[in-house]
Structure formats: structure tokens, C-alpha cells
């Protein structure tokens, strides 16, 4: 009977050996084969297929009960309050992240959603090793981010939409050269990578322009190049399209989609622009007030509201529907400035409600739409708030 091979993982590499014959050992990437979790593969499966099978099942990012509590000084107002604070200070604790757990496989492009202050950026910083968690643990490609090992630093990149890593008074190309030296990237590899990224983002004519003289969209493209020069396997993006015009947003989204498809980079994206999420992510993780409230397919989240449609009706002048009609058709809203009348109704009644609208009075225009993702997310936050209220 053929014995199966047993594979171990450390730093996202696979090491295989025959269980019944210790003289047979294959070290695919070169490291200690005794470290890491065990993974079993069929005995005659070629090693390169074993490697692919292994990576398709082992998470790239594992987060278990990750919590971060910030302790802040509570200042008492007034002069004597300041004096008292010199001797006896009062502090309050605020949990930015509470027992967050999730796993992300290699190559996944996951949206990380939540309102301002929900804990998204805090979580990304913990995964990057910039801040320590109060409790819980995380593993990224087998590494513990809190140890800040150099090998791990070469594995990931963090892009913060509102913070720059490029030197303001230098051309972008000089910042790239400095990053090449920091990461120890060979010159030939650096040139190949840079040429590819510059071509994909169409910024070849801007490399020698001072960063301070670039537009916001051009600066963000340069930030992405800087983050990807060392070919990271994991990319954390914190609102990369914030403040960009529509054309720049589209260019950045197109680049990220193509880069993820081509190199299977694992990407965790936060954004308040739902167009980013809809175009790039098949899965979303939603957090609110530090708690995870949804983790699953974006389609499933939308399907939760898919049983409803939104009817937009434009009424001429001061025309209005009878009060008895508006009160009997669920959620209705009238905008007196635009004359727009909005009705949300179940999909199965959409035809009947539309016909009733048209027969009720003069209508300038009528449109039937799906409920926007922004509204679905907002309703998710609202329902979570309602559940958390004491009875």
C-alpha cells in the first residue's frame, strides 16, 4: 500500500516527506520541515500539484479573537481639574476591535467594510505589526505580525489612502530607488517590476516629477507602485481611492483587479466607495463598533435585500399621491425639492405597485432599481444597533 506524503507549512511554503520512509524527504522551498501545521496529499501527486493543492486550502490570513483596547486620559475641565490630573488620573477604555475572527485564502480579494471608527484601520495596522493587539492572535502566511520579522515585512504591503510613504520633495523615481535599496531588490528585477507597474498605471511621464506637484490620482498610483515594488504576497489597502475623481478611481480599480488576477495577491480592502467593493470583491467582512457583524459573499448580502425593489417616480409640479395610498405601501418618501417620490416594495408586487402609481396621477418619469449596496450596508448597521439596545 502506497504511503501518503505529509506536508508542513512555514511562511507559506510547503515541505513534503513520506510518512513511512524517513529516508525520503523533499524540501520544496528550503527550511525546517518539522515546523507548522500538517497537510496530507495523495502519495503519487506531483510535487508542483501538491504545492498548488496545499496553497488552495491553507489560509493566507488567520485572525482569531483579535481585540484592541485604547486607554485614553479623561481630562477634568478647568484649572483644578488639571491640577488633580497631575496626581490622580482617570482613564477610559475604548475597544476599537472586539474579538474579530476571520480567515482569508491566498489570492482572495476581500472587502473590509464599516463606518468611520468601526476598527477597520486598527485591524489593518495590527495585521501589519504597526500596533499590538490587546488580546487574540493573527497569522499572515504563517508569520506572527507582532514579531515584526524582516521576512514578514517583505511579504506584505500597507497602503493608507490618507498617508504618504513617498518623499514629498523628491521625484517618485528617487523614492522607488530608495525602496529598492531598503528591500534589497536586485537591479534587473527592480527594473522589470517598475516597468510593468508604470505601464499598467500609465505614469511613465510623471516619474521625474516632484511628488508634491502630482495630482492626487497620480500620487495614489505612485503609492501603489511603491507598495508593490518588492512583490508582496499580501496587500492591505485602506481607502486607496479616497478623494480621487471618477476617472482615477476607475484606473485604480482596473489596475487592482488585473494585478490580483495575474499574481494572485491576497488583498484586504477598506473603502467607503461601494463601487470599489462591487467591482473588486466577491466577499465582504463588515464590522460595526469593533464587532464583526457579517462575513460572506457579497452576492448573499445583496440577496438579503434582493426581495425588494426601489421605484423612483418623478411627479410634475406640486402633484402628490393620496395619503391613503402612501401609507399603505410600506416604505415611501417624497423629496419636495426634486419632486422625486421613492417607494420600496417587495419584488413580487413591483408590477402591481408600478401600475397603481401610473394610474394614481400624472407621472413625469418612473424608474425601477435594485436597492443600492450603500443602503443595504446602512440597514445592516441600523439593525445591529437595534439588536444591541437593552430590552
Regions found by a protein language model. Name each.
Residues 235-239:
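Catalytic Walker B motif of ABC-type/P-loop ATPase nucleotide-binding domains
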Residues 231:
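Conserved catalytic motifs of ABC-family nucleotide-binding domains
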Residues 253-344:
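ABC transporter nucleotide-binding domain
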Residues 169, 210-214:
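Conserved ABC ATPase signature
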Residues 136-146, 151-156:
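Conserved ABC transporter NBD signature motif
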Residues 78-86, 177, 181, 188-206:
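Conserved ABC ATPase "signature" region
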Amino acid at each position: 500500500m502506497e504511503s501518503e506524503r505529509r506536508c508542513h507549512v512555514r511562511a507559506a511554503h510547503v515541505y513534503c516527506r513520506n510518512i513511512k520512509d524517513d529516508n525520503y524527504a523533499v524540501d520544496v522551498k528550503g527550511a525546517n520541515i518539522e515546523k507548522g501545521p500538517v497537510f496530507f496529499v495523495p502519495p503519487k501527486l506531483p510535487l508542483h500539484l501538491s504545492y498548488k493543492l496545499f496553497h488552495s486550502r491553507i489560509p493566507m490570513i488567520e485572525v482569531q479573537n483579535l481585540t484592541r483596547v485604547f486607554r485614553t486620559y479623561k481630562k477634568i475641565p478647568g484649572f483644578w481639574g488639571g491640577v488633580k490630573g497631575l496626581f490622580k488620573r482617570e482613564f477610559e477604555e475604548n475597544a476599537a476591535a472586539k474579538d474579530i475572527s476571520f480567515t482569508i485564502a491566498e489570492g482572495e480579494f476581500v472587502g473590509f467594510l464599516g463606518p468611520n471608527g468601526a476598527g477597520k484601520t486598527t485591524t489593518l495596522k495590527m495585521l501589519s505589526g504597526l500596533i499590538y493587539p490587546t488580546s487574540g492572535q493573527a497569522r499572515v502566511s504563517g508569520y506572527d505580525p507582532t514579531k515584526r520579522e524582516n521576512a514578514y515585512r517583505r511579504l506584505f504591503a500597507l497602503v493608507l489612502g490618507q498617508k504618504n510613504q513617498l518623499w514629498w520633495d523628491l521625484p517618485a523615481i528617487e523614492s522607488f530607488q530608495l525602496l529598492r535599496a531598503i528591500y534589497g531588490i536586485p537591479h534587473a528585477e527592480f527594473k522589470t517590476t517598475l516597468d510593468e507597474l508604470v505601464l499598467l498605471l500609465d505614469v511613465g511621464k510623471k516619474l521625474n516629477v516632484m511628488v508634491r506637484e502630482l495630482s492626487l490620482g497620480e500620487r495614489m498610483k505612485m503609492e501603489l507602485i511603491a507598495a508593490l515594488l518588492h512583490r508582496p504576497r499580501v496587500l492591505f489597502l485602506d481607502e486607496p481611492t479616497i478623494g480621487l475623481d471618477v476617472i482615477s478611481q476607475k484606473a485604480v480599480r482596473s489596475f487592482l483587479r488585473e494585478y490580483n488576477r495575474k499574481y494572485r495577491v491576497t488583498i484586504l480592502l477598506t473603502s467607503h466607495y461601494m463601487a470599489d467593493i462591487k467591482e473588486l470583491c466577491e466577499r465582504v467582512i463588515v464590522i460595526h463598533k469593533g464587532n464583526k457583524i457579517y462575513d460572506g459573499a457579497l452576492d448573499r448580502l445583496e440577496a438579503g435585500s434582493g426581495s425588494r425593489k426601489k421605484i423612483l417616480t418623478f411627479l410634475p409640479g406640486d402633484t402628490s399621491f393620496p395619503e391613503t395610498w402612501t401609507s399603505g405601501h410600506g416604505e415611501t418618501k417624497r423629496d419636495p425639492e426634486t419632486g422625486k417620490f421613492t417607494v420600496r416594495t417587495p419584488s413580487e408586487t413591483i408590477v402591481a405597485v408600478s401600475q397603481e402609481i401610473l394610474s394614481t396621477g400624472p407621472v413625469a418619469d418612473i424608474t425601477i432599481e435594485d436597492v443600492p449596496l450603500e443602503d443595504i450596508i446602512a440597514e445592516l448597521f441600523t439593525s445591529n444597533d437595534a439588536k444591541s439596545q437593552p430590552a
